[in-house]
Amino acid sequence: TDTADQTIDTRYLKRLIDLSGQVDAARERLVTGKHGLGRARYGIAVSGSRTAAWAASFPRNPFQVPVVVDMSGAAGQLAAGLVEGHLDETTEMVRLLRLARLEIDRPDGLDWKRDALKALHWEELEPEELELCPPLILLGSDEMLAARGLSQLVWLLNSRLPVKVLVLSSLEMGLVEASVNDARAGIGLLALAQRNAFVAQTSIGDAVHFGDSVMQALAFDGPALVQVYAPSPSRDGYAIDELVEQSVRAVAARTLPLFRYDPRAEGVFGSRISLDGNPQSDSLLVVNDDDVTYTPVDWAFAQGRFATHFKPLGQSAPSSVPVHEWFALDAAGRRGKTAFVAIEDG
C-alpha cells in the first residue's frame, strides 16, 4: 500500500509557533493590557498654557485615557508625531496578521509576498485595518490652535493623519483686542477652505448637533476639525446661569452658523456642506415666536466684553433704525442711518 509522506517541515512549524505567540501577545495588549481594560480607545494632546499645567500631573487629572499637555506652542507637531506612532504600531499589527494568513494559506509567490510585507506603510492599509488605530484628539483654545499654532493646524488638515482637532472657540471676533486679520474669527471657514478634512462648526447650546459632529469626526478616516463655541461667563461678562442661553443665542443670531463638511459626500465642494441644525435657515435673520429678531449685535450686546463698542443713542443721532432693519438695507440705504439696540428698563 502507498504510505503518505510523514516528513515534518520543522522550519515551517517553528514559524507557525512563533507567529502564534506573537499574535497571542498582540491580542493580549489589545484586549486585556496591564490593567485588564485593553488598549485605550483614544488619546488626547492638550495645547495648553500655564493655566493647563495641572492637567499634566498624573493621576491628579480627570482623564481616563493617555494625555499629554504641550506648553511650548507646538501641539500640532506633537499630535502629528503621536499619531504617527499609533499608526506605526497599527501597521506592525496588521503586518503580523497578514503574515500569519500567508503562512496558513501558503499561496504562490509566498517568499516575495512575505518580503513585500516588510515595506508595508500605513497608507496602504484597508479601511477596516485603519480602524484598529485609536484616534488622537488635539484639544485647545482658538488662541492656542488658530492664532499661535495656525501654520501647524493648516498642515495637519492637509495631511492624511487621523488627528481630530477640537477647538474651543471664544468667538472673540477680533473685537476685544485690536488685532488685524485674526484667524480665530474665521477658523471654521479657514478649515473648510482646505477641502481635505472633515469640518464642523457647532455649539454646546445644541447638544445633538455637537454630539453628531464629534461622532462623524471620529468616524472620518483622515484629519477632522470641530470648532465648538465654549463660552465663559467670567471671561465674557455675564451671569453663569446664562451660559447655555448665550450658546443658543450665538446660533440664533447667526454669529456662529452651524455647518458640517464631509469630503466623502457626493457632489462638488459646495454641495458637501450641510447647514442642518440652523433655525430658519432660509431666512437672513431668525425671528422668534414673540416676533423678536435676533442679530449678531444682540448677541454681542449681552456680553460685558463688548461693552466698549456700545454707547447710549443720543438725540442727535441721524435717522436711527432698529439694528435688524439696518441689516436688511443695502449699502446705499444704510448711509446716514444709525443702528440701535432696544433694551427694556430694569
Task: Pin down the residues of each PLM region.
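Flexible, low-complexity linker and terminal segments
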Residues: 1, 39-42, 65-97, 232-346
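Cofactor-binding active-site loop characterized by glycine-rich and histidine/acidic residues
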Residues: 1-164, 173, 177-194
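Glycine-rich ThDP/TPP pyrophosphate-binding loop and its adjacent helix/strand module
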Residues: 115-137, 143-289
